[in-house]
Design a protein with these regions (language model features):
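Cyclophilin-like peptidyl-prolyl cis-trans isomerases
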Residues: 2-4, 8-9, 20-232
Length: 232
């Protein structure tokens, strides 16, 4: 099947439900404490980012001829660089690059931190509600095998709200950064690996969740100021 035909399967829809699965759906994979781990200190600038309505960005109609190699997320806590999986997830990377180049992620908060059962920082929702996304969705790609720690530390994967109608997918803009080896159902497209800045994500995790829980808004606010997409 050609890439052009695959891209025509992009579904126009607004995701109205909270993305990703509850940590209660998973047993804790290991007994490691994020707070007890030795993590380098980081310095975060104050962010003025708040939940907001993002700009409208139209979906790409076909896969990019050159799949971007890196996404650099400039945050108030430093740069997080993600090296993509390239041709293993061409639709996902193309749509994320389209959103990034359209300013969709600019000044958006990473709205959710989970520190028990699964170990992720979730970003990509400018509304900061967990239910935001662009006006289109697309199918899953590059799903891992089922098994222990199938989303290892450094993995970057898409959040979603299920497989969608006839497997059309519910991927949009939200993604999660894995800061410690995590076991999940093999339902989330892996599109990259953190090659710079994992220490930033770990430090955010070490600072914990507001209210002292294990799933919610990070104590230390972290916002994406802008995203630079590169082919080199």
């Amino acid at each position: 099947m050609s890439r052009r035909v695959q891209m025509k399967r992009v579904v126009v829809a607004v995701i109205a439900t909270s993305l990703f699965l509850s940590p209660s759906a998973f047993a804790e994979a290991n007994g490691k404490s994020v707070k007890s781990a030795k993590i380098p200190a980081i310095k975060c600038a104050t962010t003025k980012a708040v939940g907001h309505t993002p700009p409208s960005v139209a979906p790409a109609e076909k896969v990019l001829r050159r799949i971007p190699r890196t996404f650099t997320f400039a945050t108030n806590c430093g740069n997080i660089v993600v090296t993509t999986v390239g041709a293993k997830a061409p639709i996902t990377i193309t749509q994320l690059a389209t959103l990034a180049r359209g300013g969709y992620f600019n000044d958006s908060l990473c709205h959710r931190l989970t520190t028990k059962g699964l170990y992720v920082l979730q970003c990509g929702d400018p509304t900061a509600t967990g239910g935001g996304g662009p006006n289109f969705t697309y199918r899953d790609e590059n799903l891992p095998a089922e098994g222990l720690y199938n989303y290892p530390a450094g993995t970057v994967a898409m959040a979603n709200s299920g497989p969608g109608v006839n497997g059309a997918g519910t991927n949009g803009s939200q993604f999660f950064l894995v800061f410690a080896d995590t076991t999940l159902g093999a339902n989330y497209t892996i599109w990259g690996t953190i090659t710079q800045g994992l220490d930033i994500v770990k430090a955010i995790a070490k600072a914990g969740v507001k209210g002292g829980g294990v799933d919610g808004t990070p104590n230390q606010p972290i916002s994406i100021k802008r995203v630079t997409v590169s082919n080199s």
